[in-house]
Amino acid sequence: MTATTASSAKPYLQIQGLVKKFGDNYAVDNIDLNIYQNEIFALLGSSGSGKSTLLRMLAGMESPNQGKIILDGQDITKLAPYDRPINTMFQSYALFPHMTVEQNIAFGLKQDKMPKGEIDARVEEMLRLVQMTKFAKRKPHQLSGGQQQRIALARSLAKRPKILLLDEPLGALDKKLRQQTQLELVNTLEQVGVTCIMVTHDQEEAMTMATRIAIMSDGQLQQVGTPSDVYDYPNSRFTAEFIGETNIFDGVVIENHADYAVIECEGLENHVRIDHGLGGPSEQDLWVSIRPEDIDLYKEKPEYLGDYNWAKGTVKEIAYLGSFAIYHIKLANGRVVKSQVPAPYWYVRNIITPPTWDETVYISWPENQPTPLFR
């Protein structure tokens, strides 16, 4: 489901004013959220943000202090977990070690007293879906981590839930396998057409898999949007710093026009100019966020640089990360700015020797890249 489709559709899951307290502490603080059918929706936040507590309330494992959970028009707030058309796949997978793969998948169906012929057909269907048919007779300990993840997914989908909850679904896998499995999991969920809500602290996982992301902190929603929205258009300093890397400058608006604005930033000798006007008057305080990948790096000062959007500094650190490098540039006032340079960057510019430690360099950025963040 695209963001455009979601915005015009009727919400499939409605979370209305949900609150959960432990003592005097709000684990979830008045959450309102609409999730649409066939979405893969990510709850993203650091430890203690409230994302897992929210997931547990959706599953029925925690009872809210107030608020409602409406699924497909039905109020399920007070339903027991086993009465909800919701299944959860945990990070540990929770496979029964004494059962075979096919027995694990069939377990929930047997609990529901489904006829044996239908169980066998459903198990076979799930095994084909996750491409694990030839492993049907194996026990969990005879499978790799990635294979166990597939079986846990198949078992979760076997009952055809209206909502599938994923609790750190790939957290038990190593990084390389996790990256490979992300797209496999998305493909499987899209084939089935199930609405999915996943909890993760892994930004890359959320950005890769989710249709939309809700960023949580201190039990509250900080921003909800598509992966590109929350990365390119953060609505607060918290979101800008939480998603990816960024350079944050304290600033004050000194010019504000219909089609551009000029901001004086602490630590930058030259002002920052952006290609659009800002709401509100001049002289308002704000922050300016500039992503490292949006900052160009030069050994010599380009002739076209004018009065805005550039600075001079010294290379203090270089982190080589294969396909790109992160340069830490120390400015005259001691402020350090990060610039992310792709591997072919210097080759394209016919520069044989890239800048190195303690070398003077120049950085610049286009007018459309700085993001103003109001206080």
Task: Report residues per predicted region.
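Conserved coupling/switch loops of ABC nucleotide-binding domains, chiefly the family-specific signature
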Residues: 65-68, 118, 218, 250
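Non-catalytic connector elements of ABC transporters
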Residues: 246, 256-375
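Helix-to-loop junction immediately C-terminal to a conserved catalytic motif
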Residues: 59
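The feature captures the beta-strand-to-loop junction immediately N-terminal to the Walker
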Residues: 44-46
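ABC ATPase nucleotide-binding domains
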Residues: 40, 81-241
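Conserved ABC transporter NBD signature motif
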Residues: 67-75
